[in-house]
Amino acid sequence: MSKFEKDGVNRRELLGTSLTAATLAGTAGLAAGGATIMVANQAPAHAESDDDHHKKAMVPPGKLDEYYGFWSGGHSGEVRVLGLPSMRELIRIPVFNRCSASGWGITNESLQIINESLTPESRAYLDSIGQKAYLNGDLHHPRPSYTDGAYDGRYLFVNDKANTRLARIRLDVMKCDKMVQIPNAHSIHGLRLQRYPRTGYAFCNGENRTPIPNVGKMLDDSKKWSSVFSAVDGDTMQVAWQVIVSGNLDNNDADYKGKYIASTSYNAEEGRTVAEMTASDKDHIVVFNLPAIEQAIKDGKFETINGAKVLDGRKSSKLGITVYIPVANSPHGCNAAPDGKHLIINGKLSPTVTVFAWDKFDDVFAGKIKGEEAIVANLEVGLGPLHTTFDGKGNCYTSLFLDSQVVKWNIDEAIRAYKGEKVNPIKQKLDVHYQIGHINATHGETKEADGKWAVALCKFSKDRFLNVGPMKPENDQLIDISGDKMVLVHDGPTYAEPHDATIVHASKLN
């Protein structure tokens, strides 16, 4: 943290102050021949790294990395496996794409996996254009399976936003072995897994709202469209149940007790145009009550649509399986802290993160408190907060897309500040390069978060690498978070478009 940040001056304020001071001082100097105040020469803190931190990230020839990193390939449709901390690419796992090197998407065996769970509508569409399978995919959110809140090394689950699919990769052989196309939903985006007692369910957010069933009716009345929250059985790779919700679902995450899943949501207005979708300054999160959902399925309170058991979880529903809690407009990332107690909602359009207490949802569902009373902190962190990861020591690391920074802050101090105590929860802001999206730390999404490394996935590299023409590589930056201060130690050029990554200790895989 720079002197200016300690004194409460951020980069944007410094720039404005510097320009003003330099202009005024220059004018005074011309008029009186006096010395000008060179405030503009005092630059904000940059993400400098030193030799000691660089050496920690070096893996000599013949030596092995400590961690596996699983990178989503975005529109390439593949998973990229890296070693950490070296950031060396080890292999690529084709999933939603075709691969001439391995034959994936070409051989009968792979086509069987890719096509076995396509919906009838997709099969008919592919037949009409003379294709055996989809040739593309938008692979997001690689998530390893859990047992009791820790990675168990069995599977990696990934979603396809382009064609509404979920795929499973066996981690013992690093190959895709199952795939399912999810009916009724459209554009699977948010993907997180059941942490307790095990995975269990893969929870999938259908982001875009469509008529259900989508058979060419209700096209002119968007109020009758819905997003769909789906639970896929991770063992059978079949849709277990679905919940229709109000608004557009974005990202989700599950607790560490097997009781609740929360999802960010935008377009509470349920409009179609940008003006309609952003008319309100509030949106909401949706909290799903897993035991209540499973009981409703047992009691037969579902409707079967396109072969799936579908429950009504909209605001008007009387089933008691969801609650809607207002938050600032268009929340994005949804991240469960390793302490098992807290849930972080990242504001995106709001410069804030909102902290919920998982156990307070018991009273919200019981009607004892309002949803807003489950909020225990609300902290201003910077512009464009998208995602948060954790070090297991009570600290959070939030990506700031517009500021191109990672901000380190403390949960307990944020809660104390929310109660009115004079404490500054923000510990450091680190420049990254540039426009960071996802961020993830070593085991940061488990109860075993170890606080060693974090990876910042930056959308633009700009001037960080040799020029290769108009399509620049993206930039995956390795950050040492083991000490009191974050230190940038590596720039990794990456072909478009890694969307997210998770990091697993090598000892977890067989």
Please place each PLM-identified region on the residue numbering.
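N-terminal secretory signal peptides
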Residues: 1-23, 28, 37
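Signal peptide processing junction and immediate N-terminal pro/mature segment
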Residues: 31-47
